Amino acid sequence: METWQEVTVHVHRDAQEAVSYVLIETGSQGVAIADSADYIGQKDRFGELYPDVEQSDMIAITAYYPSSTNLADVIATINEQLAELASFGLQVGQVTVDSQELAEEDWADNWKKYYEPARITHDLTIVPSWTDYDASAGEKVIKLDPGMAFGTGTHPTTKMSLFALEQILRGGETVIDVGTGSGVLSIASSLLGAKTIYAYDLDDVAVRVAQENIDLNQGTDNIHVAAGDLLKGVSQEADVIVANILADILVLLTDDAYRLVKDQGYLILSGIISEKLDMVLEAAFSAGFFLETHMIQGEWNALVFKKTDDISGVIGG
């Protein structure tokens, strides 16, 4: 029986995406995230609060490596990368790293124990694909099986993106989802009434996972997934473009986004740590967008821009 090695990193919640990326880059076959915030305000089937969940700003990110991996080298690299992230101003917190071995069948399912149904916005709830869930009236359920390499939709950057989509979409829109990952934003757009959604990701694994998640949700055959490098080569105009990726990448797509967003349309940018906020704002303003909404959760920012000649009620330019 093949064994796997498990490394758990305890970091501040704001560092979730950056640290997950570090773990994948060091050879992890997947990550699982345990975050006490996912339980805040959640209730079980009988209306009772989840019991005795201690709330903390720290989260546990568990990565899984083949038994052949030199774990000492991996942990040394992880510590170096985490120190570098902290030097860039990202709030990492007091980092601790633990490791252990586990059997393959445990590795395959271990991450699922951290993943519970979560009400993300007023209307949207994300539910693991293996969980039975009875939706309430008006509740829109996103079935998701992100695999171990993608987030579960509960990170602040994803939450703010979903909130923005819920506020903007009224039905009949064309949406472009850049860096789709698990496909959660595309699925949400479909459930919120968008007519057609185009989802792009540079990673072939993400394209496959997104399509698998789309197939889990009924009525989402209006989502078209393809490999793509941001908006390069895209000619389809859209009412809304949404991108939840790193700030350094967001600034590379603002000009193409302005070309593709229809007049009175929206650009939603998320995944922005506070230190990178001005850089993203400058790129979007230079492209011609006006800022309509700025959302903040912890160290993370999400921005909603509008393409318009009527600047009443908007900021920037």
Curated annotation (Swiss-Prot):
S-adenosyl-L-methionine binds at T158, G179, D201, N244. The keyword Methyltransferase applies. One of its GO terms (molecular function) is protein-lysine N-methyltransferase activity. It is found in: Cytoplasm. InterPro entries: Ribosomal_L11_MeTrfase_PrmA, Ribosomal_PrmA_MeTrfase, SAM-dependent_MTases_sf. It catalyses: L-lysyl-[protein] + 3 S-adenosyl-L-methionine = N(6),N(6),N(6)-trimethyl-L-lysyl-[protein] + 3 S-adenosyl-L-homocysteine + 3 H(+). It is an enzyme of class 2 (transferase). Methylates ribosomal protein L11. This is Ribosomal protein L11 methyltransferase. It comes from Streptococcus pyogenes serotype M5 (strain Manfredo).
